């Protein structure tokens, strides 16, 4: 999957009969309002696709169990702007940051909703905020991206051998 910023579309890139193809499979919000999709995250089981749109501050969830016909099943406003999303492998914890580019970032808005890091839990029906940092209030600069460290992602893929960690080939 990929998104197009100014036309606000989701495209599927797939292989068929030994040829790569692409096709538009969904619109994201009202394209005339330029929601500006900036980040996507696919669940570990490849069934769900999260799409963040910076201009309206929303995250949208699509059921992509049939990748040729996704269905939007959820949306939530995360802040006045939203940029990156990172999710845990079990799909229960989500981390959002807000800064796209310093010169483009909004300068006015709700307290705590312009420059932030926010953590949420997903229960299968709603995102519930569990933690947040207002980067303006804390004078921390512009939060662009947050990712899990390699140990958190790949802890099960390591084997101790002579007291050294070795990545296993699969």
Predicted regions and their residues:
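Short loop/turn segments immediately following beta-strands, especially the blade-tip
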Residues: 12-21, 61-69, 119-131
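Sequence/structural signature of beta-propeller modules
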Residues: 129-170
């Amino acid at each position: 999957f990929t998104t197009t910023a100014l036309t606000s579309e989701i495209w599927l890139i797939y292989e068929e009969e030994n040829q790569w193809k692409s096709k538009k499979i969904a619109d994201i919000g009202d394209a005339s309002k330029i929601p500006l999709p900036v980040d996507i995250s696919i669940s570990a089981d490849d069934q769900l696709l999260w799409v963040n749109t910076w201009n309206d501050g929303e995250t949208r969830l699509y059921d992509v169990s049939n990748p040729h016909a996704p269905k939007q099943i959820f949306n939530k406003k995360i802040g006045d702007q939203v940029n990156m999303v990172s999710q845990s492998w079990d799909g229960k914890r989500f981390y959002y940051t807000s800064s796209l580019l310093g010169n483009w970032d909004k300068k006015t808005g709700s307290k705590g909703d312009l420059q932030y890091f926010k953590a949420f839990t997903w229960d299968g029906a709603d995102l519930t905020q569990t933690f947040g940092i207002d980067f303006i209030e804390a004078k921390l600069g512009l939060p662009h991206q947050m990712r899990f460290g390699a140990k958190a992602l790949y802890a099960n893929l390591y084997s101790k051998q002579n007291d050294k960690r070795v990545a296993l080939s699969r």
